[in-house]
Structure formats: structure tokens, C-alpha cells
């Protein structure tokens, strides 16, 4: 059985991780277009 604390931490980190990856990819995409790179 999973401890509530561990479950809470995992459920809290997943959205943050996904958001971080999305922001990083978006910034890289914008920066690439700014310099004319694909």
C-alpha cells in the first residue's frame, strides 16, 4: 500500500514536471525561430 505522503508528492510533482518540460520546449522553439534555426 502506498503511503499518502508519497502519493501526494508524486501527484504534486507530475504536473510541475510536465509544465516545466512544456515551458522549456516552448522557449527553445521561440528562441530557435528568433535566430532563424529550425
Swiss-Prot record:
Subcellular location, principal: membrane
Keyword terms, alphabetized: Electron transport, Membrane, Photosynthesis, Thylakoid, Transmembrane, Transmembrane helix, Transport
Subcellular location, record wording: Cellular thylakoid membrane
Signal peptide start-end: none
Bilayer-crossing regions: 5-25
Any one Gene Ontology BP term: photosynthesis
Membrane topology: Single-pass membrane protein
Any one Pfam family match given in the protein's UniProt record, by short name: PetG
GO molecular function list: electron transporter, transferring electrons within cytochrome b6/f complex of photosystem II activity
One Gene Ontology term, aspect cellular component: cytochrome b6f complex
Similarity remark: Belongs to the PetG family.
Function: Component of the cytochrome b6-f complex, which mediates electron transfer between photosystem II (PSII) and photosystem I (PSI), cyclic electron flow around PSI, and state transitions. PetG is required for either the stability or assembly of the cytochrome b6-f complex.
Record note on quaternary structure: The 4 large subunits of the cytochrome b6-f complex are cytochrome b6, subunit IV (17 kDa polypeptide, PetD), cytochrome f and the Rieske protein, while the 4 small subunits are PetG, PetL, PetM and PetN. The complex functions as a dimer.
Protein name in UniProt: Cytochrome b6-f complex subunit 5
The species this protein was found in: Microcystis aeruginosa (strain NIES-843 / IAM M-2473)
Gene that encodes the chain: petG
Amino acid at each position: 500500500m502506498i503511503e499518502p505522503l508519497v502519493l501526494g508528492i508524486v501527484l504534486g510533482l507530475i504536473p510541475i514536471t510536465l509544465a516545466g518540460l512544456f515551458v522549456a520546449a516552448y522557449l527553445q522553439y521561440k528562441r530557435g525561430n528568433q535566430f532563424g534555426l529550425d
